[in-house]
Amino acid sequence: MAEIKHYQFNVVMTCSGCSGAVNKVLTKLEPDVSKIDISLEKQLVDVYTTLPYDFILEKIKKTGKEVRSGKQL
């Protein structure tokens, strides 16, 4: 079984539609994504997944949202 990793991204989101778009693209990756936490107020997206960091980063960028930073926790 692959190890679940925790990634955190600082994503520019101005409304619930923005966070909804990010949530929608990440939800499509289930079951490889086991948990998604999005804070519109803090502009943070936490992803728990077995998928590579760069793959998740590209999926978030495809929503058209600016990703200011990201890291593995």
From Swiss-Prot:
Disulfide bond sites: none
Primary subcellular site in the record, as a coarse category: cytoplasm
Keywords of this entry: Chaperone, Copper, Copper transport, Cytoplasm, Ion transport, Metal-binding, Transport
GO biological process, one term: cellular response to oxidative stress
SUPFAM superfamilies associated with the record: HMA, heavy metal-associated domain (SSF55008)
Positions bound to Cu(+): C15, C18
Activation/inhibition comment: Tetrathiomolybdate directly and reversibly down-regulates copper delivery to secreted metalloenzymes.
InterPro entries from the UniProt entry: Copper_transport_ATOX1-like, Heavy-metal-associated_CS, HMA_dom, HMA_dom_sf
Highest taxon in the source lineage: Eukaryota
Annotated compartments: Cytoplasm
Record carries keyword Cell division: no
Pfam family, one: HMA
Domain HMA as annotated: residue spans: 4-68
GO molecular function ontology, one term from the record: metal ion binding
Induction of synthesis: Expression is induced by oxygen. Expression is also induced by the iron-sensing trans-activator AFT1.
One Gene Ontology cellular component annotation held by this UniProt entry: cytosol
Family: Belongs to the ATX1 family.
Subunit structure: Homodimer. Interacts with CCC2 via the copper anion.
Entry function: Copper homeostasis factor that specifically transports copper to the secretory pathway for incorporation into copper enzymes destined for the cell surface or extracellular milieu. Shuttles copper to the transport ATPase CCC2 on a post-Golgi vesicle for eventual targeting to the cell-surface high-affinity iron uptake protein FET3. Protects against oxygen toxicity.
Protein name: Copper chaperone ATX1
Lineage of source species: Eukaryota, Fungi, Dikarya, Ascomycota, Saccharomycotina
